[in-house]
C-alpha cells in the first residue's frame, strides 16, 4: 500500500529480521529490503546515502504466520516448543529465559512486560517446577501456571505471560527505545513517525516519547523553561474499526500513534 502511494523517485526501506519474511518481498526497484532489526535504520541509511526520511512506520506486532507456526513457539497452544525468537540466529530463546533467569528477574519481566500483578507468585511457581524438570514445551508451562487462571481467564492470562517472555527474548522494549531515539535525527521537518503497538508496555513508551520527546515523565527544557520536544501529535491514537476486526481479529489490541517532526 505504501508503494502504491510512493512517487517514482521515492524509496521504501523495509526491515524484518524474520527469515520467513523474505517470501513476501515485492519486486519493485523502489523497495530496499534488509533482513535485520530496524535498530540498524541509521546505519542502513548512511549506507544508502540517505540523509533524512519523510516517514517512519514501525509495526511492533507478531505476524499470524509466526503465531501459527508451531516451530516458532510464540503461541501458548499445547505441543509447541518454547522458542519465541524473531531472529532465529540469536542464541537466547524462551527456554533459556524460563529456565535460567532468577526468580527476581522473572518476576520483574512479568510485571513490567505483562502488567501481571501476581508476578512474584508466577515466578516462584516456575522456579520451583524447573528444579524438578526443565520447562521446554508450551503444555508444560501452561500446566505449571494453571492454578493462576480459570477457564474463562485462561487465554488472556497466558497471552500476557507469553507476551512478557517474548518481549524479553527479543529485547523489544530496548529496540523500540532505540528506533524512537533515532527518529529525532532521521526525520525531516514535517516528517511523520507512526507506531503500531499491541500491548500497554509498548504503548506507554511511545505515548511518553511523543508527548515529551524523551522517555521521562517530563519533557527536556531549555534554560528558559521551553520544551525541547521535537514532535507534535498528529492525533491521539487510532484503534481498528469493526470492519478491520472482522478481517483480522488479532488486531483487536492494536493501537496506532503518530507524531510530526517540527
Regions found by a protein language model. Name each.
Residues 1-262:
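S-adenosyl-L-methionine-dependent methyltransferase catalytic core, i.e., the SAM/SAH-binding region
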